[in-house]
Amino acid sequence: MARTEQRESFRASLDKQPHEVASMFDGVAERYDLTNTVISMGQDRYWRWATRKALALRPGERVLDLAAGTGVSTVEFAKSGAWCVAADFSKGMLAAGSFREVPMVAGDAMALPFADESFDAVAISYGLRNVADPDLAMREMLRVTKPGGRLVIAEFSTPVIPVFRTVYMEYLMKALPRVARAVSSNPDAYVYLAESVRAWPNQRQLAMRMAAAGWSSVQWRNLSGGVVALHRGYRLG
């Protein structure tokens, strides 16, 4: 595969056409994990650990890690002893993570290639925001989850302290694209990141949409002052 530095810089639009989003992630795949660590100032490792804890996985459980990218989160979840499969609609991302010893499947969150009630738990980290129809995706996640199973969504959200929120938005819209230019193979993708985070629902709004999609007992926990929120819900029996 050609090195991604040779790709034309490209970003998806906020209508999130699947082919555009997949192509954009194909273009950042080679340096994706490094770029995430840099732009999050190392917080990405803590966020993955916190997501695994929120999943409360047990050995032998079956877990779907959706929008898994290169599988770095899947490896984190597998530390629990659960059987974890990574799924993503960017074949470039899956190829970049092919060295990781976890099963990987190409799949669209809006039409998951799995049977009903296949998984004890589903996680999606920083991916629901990139789906054209997040509500349909959450219903698909419900379909493939066993009764009593759970969904954890890790996603960029709304900082809870107003002053910090202002500073964060300044970083997101102005500084982050400049940082991305130094490390990413497709810095324009991080302009899309900033714009999509700004347009994303806040914590309460996302919880309401989870409930409307059929998830029960929905709660959330803020990480890093609300830069990221973990939402968890359950499928009733």
Curated annotation (Swiss-Prot):
Reactions catalysed, as given in the entry: a 2-demethylmenaquinol + S-adenosyl-L-methionine = a menaquinol + S-adenosyl-L-homocysteine + H(+)
PROSITE patterns: SAM_MT_UBIE (PS51608), UBIE_1 (PS01183), UBIE_2 (PS01184)
Pathway(s) per entry: Quinol/quinone metabolism; menaquinone biosynthesis; menaquinol from 1,4-dihydroxy-2-naphthoate: step 2/2
Root EC class: transferase
Keyword list, A-Z: Menaquinone biosynthesis, Methyltransferase, S-adenosyl-L-methionine, Transferase
Highest taxon, organism lineage: Bacteria
Annotated HAMAP family: MenG_UbiE_methyltr
Family listed: Belongs to the class I-like SAM-binding methyltransferase superfamily. MenG/UbiE family.
Function: Methyltransferase required for the conversion of demethylmenaquinol (DMKH2) to menaquinol (MKH2).
Protein name from the UniProt record: Demethylmenaquinone methyltransferase
Organism from which the protein derives: Nocardia farcinica (strain IFM 10152)
